[in-house]
């Protein structure tokens, strides 16, 4: 299993769009499900047991604004258009299911978030 794209969850069948940061695997990327919902995903934690990600649903207009440097990454998560993001815990054990839960933007902690004024600059080809 790819440790950054959960399978069989309420997020749907996800396909990678672009990678913006990479460290052993994509750390910051965009993806989209088959019905067209786009997400900006950020790797926030890792352990021997699981990797934890934040997935912010974004409209296509907002996605363009993010890619064009009009919205910083912290704002993507703290002011999601629907006021929530998904926390996705993906187990390292391929036999276990990913756990997805909705989090209100106001409940995110600073250690889960990018620093202020960080923007997507370029996509990385992998």
Task: Write out the residue ranges for each language-model feature.
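Short, surface-exposed terminal/edge motifs of secreted or surface/virion proteins that either
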Residues: 37-64
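Amphipathic, interaction-prone secondary-structure segments
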Residues: 10-46
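Cysteine-dependent deubiquitinase/ubiquitin-like isopeptidase catalytic cores across multiple families
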Residues: 4-11, 15, 116
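Low-complexity intrinsically disordered segments
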Residues: 54-126
